[in-house]
Structure formats: C-alpha cells, structure tokens
Swiss-Prot record:
Signal peptide: none annotated. The lineage of its organism: Bacteria, Bacillati, Bacillota, Bacilli, Bacillales. It comes from Staphylococcus haemolyticus (strain JCSC1435). Belongs to the TRAFAC class translation factor GTPase superfamily. Classic translation factor GTPase family. EF-G/EF-2 subfamily. Catalyzes the GTP-dependent ribosomal translocation step during translation elongation. During this step, the ribosome changes from the pre-translocational (PRE) to the post-translocational (POST) state as the newly formed A-site-bound peptidyl-tRNA and P-site-bound deacylated tRNA move to the P and E sites, respectively. Catalyzes the coordinated movement of the two tRNA molecules, the mRNA and conformational changes in the ribosome. InterPro entries: EFG_II, EFG_III, EFG_III/V, EFG_IV, EFG_V, EFG_V-like, EFTu-like_2, G_TR_CS. GO terms for molecular function: GTP binding; GTPase activity; translation elongation factor activity. PROSITE patterns: G_TR_1, G_TR_2. It is found in: Cytoplasm. This is Elongation factor G. The gene is fusA. The keyword GTP-binding applies. Residues 8-282 form the tr-type G domain. GTP binds at residues 17-24, 81-85, 135-138.
Length: 693
C-alpha cells in the first residue's frame, strides 16, 4: 500500500508548556479543526480527548503523552501532547527525543514560567526547532508584548512575533499576519468563520515596525536577507517565509504567534505556521546510530522508505483492550504488521502483531508504517523505552535515552494477602511503562520500596495501582540504607568451646581486622601455616564472618570495606566442627567491634541543581543546612548550576523545598555516589532508634 502523505508533507510535533498554560486545550482545538473530533472537550470539565487516563481527568493535568495524528492542508501532522508538571519531565524527554519540531505554549498573562524554562532547556539539548504560541489572549491581564519579552529575558531566545493581536482580554478580536501583512477577524464562536480584512489604519504603523523587527531578527541568521535589509531592498513574502523556515529549522530563530485556544481564535493560523516553518523529517539532520557488533562504527538512518528499517521505541503502555502497546518513531525503511523484527538493543527477535495509528485513546489499525511515521505496535514482548527496533539483517543501535534516577523512595505494602500477587504484577507493568519508576524489595527490611521523580509522581502511581490493577496498599515513609565499617586495625581472638556431655564444640581463631579502601568491600585472607586450623574449616571461618557482618556491630546495618586475615588458631580432633568455627569467627567480629572504632556510614548523593542566578544564595544556604558540601558552580546559558554532595537522609522533601526556594524555576537531579561517615551526634541517634531506646 502506498503512503498517504509524502515525507515532505509530514510533521512530527510536540506541544509543550508549563502546567496550566492551555496546552491540552490547544491540542483539542487542533484535533477539532483538522476534523478528528466533532465536539470539543474542555480540560476543566474533565472531558478532554487527549487526557484519557482517569487520573488525568480527575486532576485536569496531562500525565502521559498521548500521541495522535491529524491532517491539515494536505499534510500529516503527528502530535504528541506532553505533560507540563516537573514530576513528569521524563514524558517530555521521551517525546522530544522523537520529534522534529515543537509548539511551545505560553500563558499570555504569565509569559515564560518555570516549567517552560525546563522543557525549553530539554528541547535545546535535543536540538528541537520551536514555534511559540502565546495562548489565553482573552484572559484578564493578557499581555502579548510582556510574554515576548520573557522569551528574551528568561530564555535568551532569538524570538520575534510573526503575528500581532488586535486587542486583548475581552477585546481580543483579530490577528495581524506580519509576513503577508494581512489581518484575520473571527466572526463566530467556534472560530470556523474567519474574515480576511485590511489592517486597520490605527494598527498599520505598529504592524510595519513589528515586521521590520521580524526581518532584522531573521536576517541575523541569513546573510542574503541581511544584505537586502541593509540595502533597503524589497523582501518578498516567499523570501521571508523561506528565511524564517530555514532559521527555525536550524534552531536559530523562534517565530511567535498569538491566540486563544479556549475561545477558538488563532489555532488554524498556528497550524499553518506548523506547516510553513517546522521541519519535515527530510529537513532535520538524519539520526546517527552505531553497529551493535562494533560501537565505533557509525551508521546513518536515512529518512527513506527503501532503506533498512530502523525505529526507536519511545513509550510503552498497557492498554485496557489490546494489552501492551509500544509507541515508536520510524527513522528509516518501512514495517508491515505480522512481520518479524529485531530489538538490537537487547538482541531479541520480536513479532509485530498489529500496527495502530493512535488518536488519543482510540485507534485505527494500519498495515504499514513508513519512515517518518509515529505509530504503536501490539505484540512486542521484550521491548522497553529507548530500545532500537530494526530489520532482522540490520544491527544498528540508535542513540538511546538517558533517564534520571528516582529521587524519592517510599515503602508500599499490600493491605491483604490477595493484593500481594496483584501488586507484584502492577509494579512490573508500571516499571515497563515508566523508566523513572523503580521498585525493589529491600533485603534488610523486606519492604517493597518504590522510587520516582517526585511526590506527585509516586502519588499517581499508587493511585494507578488502585484504579487500574485493583491493588489496595499502605504507603509508608522512606528509609535510608545505612552501612557500618571499621576505622582502626586490631588483632582479636574468637574462641567457642562448649562441653555438655558427649561430643562438645570447639573452634578457636585469631584474626587481624583492618579497614579496607572505600568501595572495596570485604576481603578475607588465610595465612594459616602448619595446619593449626585445618583446611576444611577455613571456608567456615569466612562464612561465619560474612554472616555476622550482614547484621553489623553497632546498629544492625551491614559492615562493609573491611579486611580480615586469619593468622592463628587451634582445634580439637573430636569436638571441632564447621559450625564451631563459624561461631568462633562471629565472636571474633564482636571482639573487634570493641577495638576497631566502628562507625556508621550513610549514602551520599551527587546533587546537581540548576536555577536562575538570583536564587543562588538561598540554594547554597539550603545545601549547607542539609549537611551538604558544595563541589563547584558553573554558568549554563542564563542559569547557574551547583554541584554538591548531600546525605540522602537530608534530601527527603527537597523537590518541594527547591520549588519554594526558586518559585518553581529550579530543577535538580541526584544519584548515589559513595558512602561517608555519619557525624557522631546523628550516629548516636540512629543507634538509639535501632535498639529501641
């Protein structure tokens, strides 16, 4: 079957913004005007097409990025609606990885907001071209000029309006197109009737000045245009459009548009801009991968239907009707349903059961997907987020996605025995869907610990376990896994002797304990000569030490980074046994605890905090108050980055604290780095607590 839309006429775009900027409503209107839906659903009524999870409709926020496809002006537009909440940045990262362009939605009253900065930085990392849609022009306090100025001040972006609004708030009634110098007036509530009129006299001067600013901003990226501009030559509409398109595709310029999705104004013109200025898969740099067999050898996945098939899986989700759905972006070649492909990341063969074109949560079955398409596959068993899919003879691995480690952990336990198995299944499925969600059983406490990107993230996952998997569970407070070690060396004896009629028990060992290097773990050395401890009992001595070290010597935490050298001992022909030497070794460790200066260690996290410079003082003070050590600072764009080491026990609730300290404009990542000694006063508290004092 031939493709419906050429690659040149395909657009893969994301809609991204701060929470509540009107992103989902904007997507809804796109679907309405492109004929995909017949009734418009409002987010605040909980009936939006793109927000299809129950939790999303309850909270009125977008959690998962629903993918949908629409047609406009002879083009196919694949749209991914991304969440704007900081706890769901992984969804934004996933989407940006597979998009060719994006529409950044701003609230006309607030302009660039904290989460806009975060997603903008992510889009810059992935080199995604953007256009900006200043939404909510009908809102009280809407200010287009202010919104544009925040793009310059907060993002340092080379952005300029390609449209101007006529009026604002209740008076917002028309839009001036600065490229073609036309004016569009809306005449009905649904925004389907638009009159093209002359630019009103009292707005002409303002429009001409804005057009001149637009040409100047674009000319900075285009020598040919700059020459014409400086020579006062006439610049045609076609020349200006081409220059804007080129500069936008090169991520050197960001066109700014205006409208109100809620009141149905400006969305069709924004769709025209998507077609005119955002790139097709042919206009962006082809993705570079490497050979699975030889990571040094680069392979280019060209956007060409006749090339070898290569795609990237960017999202896995469980669908209530068809089971596991794998969303993927095709970079080269084609794929037909029912065929076999290779997951080159995991070196597994997969069969594609069915191929689906997604529309929020409804779907249409298709036979073939082509290069540049975004679709979902049913039947892939081993494929996870970030995996490369390719033809069976191909062995390309596309650059995968890196996801941050969880920053908050909680314990969960099922309320009843019946919930136990269901909870295990639910956790497996949720981890498949979300690479930033981790679950494991703590061997020391036996608790199931879940980790995620923030309180809201885990709150929603626990909620999903309840609603989708019918699992009731209790959520506890998180706990830190401490460790213990020795700071001094000592030689000690461990002797176990018991006579109680009949055969007795006898084992005697002399062991030298010394601190080992950080991270080196436990090392056992046997230096017995002359058989004072028979060879068959040596493994029992080592096993006895290992068992005893699991429970520590101070507060019940595992003892790590210690060397033990068995250098002397004695035995009894009749009474000695493996068990006796095991016990003797554990007694030696108890004795060492009195002489080797044992201490408690805590996990230290490497924390990287990014925020606008004005919050630097507050952040540094907060890090110090949390017993943190600042390791360096560096500027990044118009933000500052602080690197620090902070104890994990001090990092709980940090997301909330950072949000309030930076008015939501800071972001952070953290991961485990090493174990370090706990200050004595805190260690004493831990010991008391664990001994139940």
């Amino acid at each position: 079957m031939a493709r419906d839309f050429s690659l040149k006429n395909t657009r893969n775009i994301g809609i991204m913004a701060h929470i509540d900027a009107g992103k989902t409503t904007t997507t809804e209107r796109i679907l309405y005007y492109t004929g995909r839906i017949h009734k418009i659903g409002e987010t605040h009524e909980g009936a939006s097409q793109m927000d299809w999870m129950e939790q999303e409709q309850d909270r009125g926020i977008t959690i998962t990025s629903a993918a949908t496809t629409a047609q406009w002006d002879g083009h196919r537009v694949n749209i991914i609606d991304t969440p704007g909440h900081v706890d769901f940045t992984v969804e934004v990262e996933r989407s940006l990885r597979v998009l060719d362009g994006a529409v950044t939605v701003l609230d006309a009253q607030s302009g660039v907001e904290p989460q806009t900065e975060t997603v903008w930085r992510q889009a810059t990392t992935y080199g995604v071209p953007r256009i900006v849609f200043v939404n909510k022009m009908d809102k009280l306090g809407a200010n287009f000029d202010y919104s544009v100025s925040t793009l310059h001040d907060r993002l340092d972006a080379n952005a300029a309006p390609i449209q101007l609004p006529i009026g604002a708030e209740d008076e917002f009634e028309a839009i001036i197109d600065l490229v073609e110098m036309k004016c569009f007036k809306y005449t009905n509530d649904l925004g389907t009737e638009i009159d093209e009129i002359e630019i009103p006299e009292d707005h002409k001067e303002r429009a001409e000045e804005a057009r001149s600013n637009l040409i100047e901003a674009v000319a900075e990226t285009n020598d040919e245009l700059m020459e014409k501009y400086l020579g006062d030559e006439e610049i045609s509409v076609a020349e200006l459009k081409n220059a804007i398109r080129q500069a936008t595709t090169d991520v050197e310029f960001y066109p700014v548009l205006c409208g109100t999705a809620f009141k149905n104004k400006g969305v069709q013109l924004m769709l025209n801009a998507v077609i005119d200025y955002l790139p097709s898969p042919l206009d962006v740099k082809p993705i570079v991968g490497h050979r699975a067999e030889n990571p040094e050898e680069e392979v280019i996945a060209k956007p060409d239907d006749s090339a070898e098939f290569a795609a990237l899986a960017f999202k896995v989700m469980t669908d209530p009707y068809v089971g596991k759905l794998t969303f993927f972006r095709v970079y080269s070649g084609t794929l037909t349903s029912g065929s076999y492909i290779k997951n080159s990341t995991k070196d597994k063969r997969e069969r594609v059961g069915r191929l689906l074109q997604m529309h929020a949560n409804s779907r249409q079955e298709i036979d073939t997907v082509y290069s540049g398409d975004i679709a979902a596959a049913v039947g892939l068993k081993d494929t996870g987020t970030g995996d490369t899919l390719c033809g069976e003879k191909n062995d390309i691995i596309l650059e995968s996605m890196e996801f941050p480690e969880p920053v908050i952990h909680l314990s969960v336990e099922p309320k009843s025995k019946a919930d136990q198995d269901k909870m295990t299944q639910a956790l497996v499925k949720l981890q498949e869907e979300d690479p930033t969600f981790h679950a494991h059983t703590d061997e020391e406490t036996g608790q199931v610990i879940i980790g995620g990107m923030g309180e809201l993230h885990l709150d929603i996952l626990v909620d999903r376990m309840k609603k989708e998997f019918n699992v009731e569970c209790n959520v506890g407070a998180p706990m830190v896994s401490y460790r213990e070690t020795f700071k001094q060396s000592a030689q000690v004896q461990g002797k176990f002797s018991r006579q109680s009629g009949g055969r007795g028990q006898y084992g005697d060992v002399h062991i030298e304990f010394t601190p080992n290097e950080t991270g080196a773990g436990f090392e056992f050395e046997n230096s017995i000569v002359g058989g004072v401890v028979p060879r068959e009992y040596i493994p029992s001595v080592e096993a006895g030490l290992k068992d005893a070290m699991e429970n520590g010597v101070l507060a019940g935490y595992p003892l790590i980074d210690v060397k033990a050298k068995l250098f002397d001992g004695s035995y009894h022909d009749v009474d000695s046994s493996e068990m006796a030497f095991k016990i003797a070794a554990s007694l030696a460790l108890k004795e060492a605890a009195k002489k080797c200066d044992p201490v408690i260690l805590e996990p230290m996290m490497k924390v990287t905090i990014e925020m606008p410079e004005e919050y630097m003082g507050d952040i540094m003070g907060d890090v110090t108050a949390r017993r943190g050590r600042v390791d360096g600072m560096e500027p990044r764009g118009n933000a500052q980055v602080v690197n620090a080491y902070v104890p994990l026990s001090e990092m709980f609730g940090y997301a909330t604290s950072l949000r309030s300290n930076t008015q939501g404009r800071g972001t952070y990542t953290m991961y485990f780095d090493h174990y370090a000694e706990v200050p004595k006063s805190i260690a004493d508290d831990i010991i008391k607590k664990n001994k139940g004092e």
